[in-house]
Swiss-Prot record:
Endonuclease that specifically degrades the RNA of RNA-DNA hybrids. PANTHER family: RIBONUCLEASE H2 SUBUNIT A, RIBONUCLEASE HII. SUPFAM superfamilies: Ribonuclease H-like. Manganese or magnesium. Binds 1 divalent metal ion per monomer in the absence of substrate. May bind a second metal ion after substrate binding. Belongs to the RNase HII family. GO terms for molecular function: manganese ion binding; RNA binding; RNA-DNA hybrid ribonuclease activity. A divalent metal cation binds at residues 17-18, 109. It is found in: Cytoplasm. Its EC number is 3.1.26.4. This is Ribonuclease HII. It catalyses: Endonucleolytic cleavage to 5'-phosphomonoester. NCBIfam families: PRK00015.1-1 (NF000594), PRK00015.1-3 (NF000595), PRK00015.1-4 (NF000596).
């Protein structure tokens, strides 16, 4: 799955991906995963192309079989202070730094890499091309969706379990009706507009 992207001296490759750049609420969540070549995981794919049930099953398998995995995050307040791009890079750094095994090489989904003390490469559409990035994509998505379920219990009127914080018609309507929660990203235009900022 990653034949074109192997760093010639790398044995331990970490894949990194993020979920939650677009939502109006909550953290951006990242994951870093070092897979075990002796325990391949079938069915890895971009998390957006998998059903919720399949993602949850795969997340459990990834956590059991991976050599190492970790999550990172940047909260809504950090997103507002830094902007979403810099907050995403910070969350990726946190995920990589939280790994209990240091990778030889890091493959990051997208076209930018965070500042790291190890070699790294950005892979456009990496969540569909690189097993480690697919695994990271799944862990980050399952973790963030779970957080949205919890937020939905705290603020049931917003429908977070349904739209996961993305700027859907329903979310914008509820935002206009009820105002922003403390977890909304105040720097994002629809929230700023509601708050009159």
């Amino acid at each position: 799955m990653r034949t074109n992207f192997i760093y010639h001296n790398a044995n331990l490759i970490a894949g990194v991906d993020e979920v939650g750049r677009g939502p109006l609420v909550g953290a951006v969540v990242t994951a870093a995963v070092i897979l075990d070549p002796q325990q391949p995981i079938l069915g890895l794919a971009d998390s957006k192309k998998l059903s919720e049930k399949k993602r949850i099953l795969l997340a459990t398998e990834i956590k059991q079989k991976a050599l190492c995995w970790s999550l990172g995050r940047a909260e809504a307040e950090e997103i507002d202070q830094l902007n979403i791009l810099h907050a995403t890079m910070l969350a990726m750094q946190r995920a990589i730094n939280a790994l209990t095994i240091q990778p030889d090489f890091v493959l990051v989904d997208g076209n930018r890499i965070p500042s790291l003390n190890m070699p790294a490469q950005a892979i456009v559409k990496g969540d569909s091309l690189v097993a480690e990035i697919s695994a990271a994509s799944i862990l980050a998505k399952v973790a963030r969706d779970h957080e949205m379920q919890i937020l939905d219990q705290q603020f049931p009127e917003y429908g977070f379990a349904q739209h996961k914080g993305y700027p859907t018609k329903l979310h914008i309507e509820k935002l206009a009706q009820f105002g922003a929660t403390p977890f909304h990203r105040k720097s994002f235009a629809p929230v700023r507009k509601i708050l009159g900022l």
